[in-house]
Each structure stands twice: as C-alpha cells, then as structure tokens.
Amino acid sequence: MITIGTALRPAATRVMLLGAGELGKEVAIECQRLGIEVIAVGHYADAPAMHIAHRHHVINMLDGAALRAVIEHERPHFIVPEIEAIATDMLVTLEQEGHHVVPCANATRLTMNREGIRRLAAETLSLPTSRYRFAADRAELDKAVEAIGYPFIIKPVMSSSGKGQSLVRDAAQLDAAWQYAQLGGRAGGGKVIVEGLVAFDFEITLLTINAVDGIHFCAPIGHRQEDGDYRESWQPQHMSALARQRAQTIAADVVTALGGKGLFGVELFICGDDVIFSEVSPRPHDTGMVTLISQDLSEFALHVRAFLGLPIGTIRQYGPAASAVILPELQSDNVSFSGLENALAAGQQIRLFGKPDLSGKRRLGVALAVAATVEEAVTVAKDAAAAVRVTG
C-alpha cells in the first residue's frame, strides 16, 4: 500500500527536484495535486519550479558537496533530477546510503554522459545505432574522423539542447567544430562523440514508463529541431505497425537496462520499418510537452505516478495535437507577454514558464493545440505561439 503524507506536516512526503526549469515546474504541479511537499533546487534564482515549490535552494549542482548538503538538510523521500548537469557520482553514493533517486542513480549517471548510454545501447544491448567514435583530444578526433568519414555530427559527451553540437561537412570546418564542442560541454571541455549521419525519414520521442504495473508507452511523438533544440512537436506521429513494434521493443530494452521506476524519453530515428536508437533521458522530455493537451495523463503526471509506485493503467490519447515553442530574442530581466487573446481559441492553450530573464534567444513558453489532423494542429500551435508578443 502506498501512503502519501500531507505537505508541511510531520508525515509529509517530500520530493526534491534537481533542476527547476519548465519541466520541473510541471512535475512540481503534479506533486502538488497529490499534496506532496516540493523542494526545488536550481542553479539560478527565481527559476520556474521555484515559483510553486514549498521551498527552494540555489546551488551549483555539479558540486557534490553542495548537493549532499542540501539533500541532507531537506531529507527528501524522492530525489528527482530534471536536468543532466548534476554531480551524478554523488547521487550514486547517496543512493547507496539509502536515498531514493528517480528513476535510479545509475540511470542518471549513464544518461548524463553520451558515452555511457551509447556504449550501453550499442555494445551491451546490441541495439542499432549510428556509427560512432569517441575522442578525448584533437589527435583522437582526427582518428575518429578518419574512421567515420565526412559528413558527421560532433557533440560533447556532456551537453544538452544542442550546445556544442555541429554538422561537419569537410576538413575546413573541423577546427571550429572542435572548439565549439569544447565550449559547449556542461562541465567544460572534454570528450566528444563523432557520429556518422543516419538516413532517416523522421525522428520520434517514445515516452516510455516503467511502473509498478509494467512498462507503458505513449503514442509516438514527432518533432522538428533547429539549432539542436525542438521547435514543434506533435502526437501521434504516423508510422508503420512494424516500426512502432520495433520502437517499443528497443525502448523497453533500454529502460529495463537503466532500471528504476519513472518516465523515460527515448529518442529514435525511423526509416521505413527500421528503427535506430539515438538517445534517452530518464525524465520527462521537452518534446513531450504536447502531452499537456494530447493525453488524459501528461508525461509529468505519468512520471510522478510511476516513481511514487502508483499504477498507470490505460493512457488515453485524445487525437491529433501539437506544441510550438515561444522563443523570443531580446535582453531583459523584466519580461511581459501580450497578445494572449489571439492565441486562445477553442482547442488552444498557452503555458508561460515564468523564467526571470533572457539574454538572446530563450524558450519562455509553449503553445498547445488540438485539431482534426496533426498537420493542422502544428499550424495552429505555430500561429498561436507567433501571436504571443514578448517585450521587456
């Protein structure tokens, strides 16, 4: 029997979010719906999840000592990473001491580093992946390029949202790509992965939930990326029955190997009936924000249910739906939004994240839409996002 204590009382069930961005905010909201006490930890003040958490802390989460200190101070029942830039070795140690890391510390450690998850997928599980090599210095990079050939993608093994990532078409671009990769890593310069290009029809995110009542899948989510970050996502992505079956098999193998209960965002390339593994996040995925309007249980609700040990049951997908990001470009620490009345027709919703500032481009919200077809939903969501005016 699962027992949930009431927030701010001695028997409270406490959830600590490591990362307080827009995804963490939605996880916090789902915890609040169940009366759970929420502590948000982030690397900058006034982050979105901090607005609604019972308490919050600002620390460098790559500092293992600082991470241990805040966890020992708050004594959470569940430690829920929302970002990759965390001292994962400390999470492993804390888990060994009896703390509950979601889904588990090993999954967080492996997926923070592209080398760990790629070797697990390709070498341990023998899943189909792109051709790849790792390089720790410039000399190793030359050897990796010789083995993979042009064109290729270079990425820091520790980065996210496209940071440090480049498409390299010829040798003239190699030096700049290497330098960019060294600047883009979450923990500073370091090892990179060199990946051969994959011929694919489209990419999907397959939200996969490992729960007390088994493994569950959301309908596949298609998405468009630009500069390494998502711009629109939609659900369901049409694909053949065989490809969908293969995608679910790969996703189940990956999340089972990683271990722990929770929701995982499994990224896959689809080419006809063939499926190639790309990456996985052991947490809600940004492309999955479409589930805020497309399903009866969003990816955030599913994650919370799973890590609490509650059953998932049946996930109901309502039909064609899409999300489109609100991505302004300006300098401001006093942002305002207008034009919302033009973005809220029937079948449309807006989420504004409440980020405190921006310097250049930053994702500040998302438009959500349902429609008769996926294509129409994408158009409606993009138009709604464009209707929101951001000033500051």
From Swiss-Prot:
ATP binds at R114, K155, S160, S161, G162, K163, G164, Q165, E195, G196, L197, V198, E203. Pathway: Purine metabolism; IMP biosynthesis via de novo pathway; N(2)-formyl-N(1)-(5-phospho-D-ribosyl)glycinamide from N(1)-(5-phospho-D-ribosyl)glycinamide (formate route): step 1/1. It catalyses: N(1)-(5-phospho-beta-D-ribosyl)glycinamide + formate + ATP = N(2)-formyl-N(1)-(5-phospho-beta-D-ribosyl)glycinamide + ADP + phosphate + H(+). One of its GO terms (cellular component) is cytosol. Mg(2+) binds at E267, E279. Residues 119-308 form the ATP-grasp domain. GO terms for molecular function: ATP binding; magnesium ion binding; phosphoribosylglycinamide formyltransferase 2 activity; phosphoribosylglycinamide formyltransferase activity. Homodimer. Involved in the de novo purine biosynthesis. Catalyzes the transfer of formate to 5-phospho-ribosyl-glycinamide (GAR), producing 5-phospho-ribosyl-N-formylglycinamide (FGAR). Formate is provided by PurU via hydrolysis of 10-formyl-tetrahydrofolate. This is Formate-dependent phosphoribosylglycinamide formyltransferase. It comes from Sodalis glossinidius (strain morsitans).
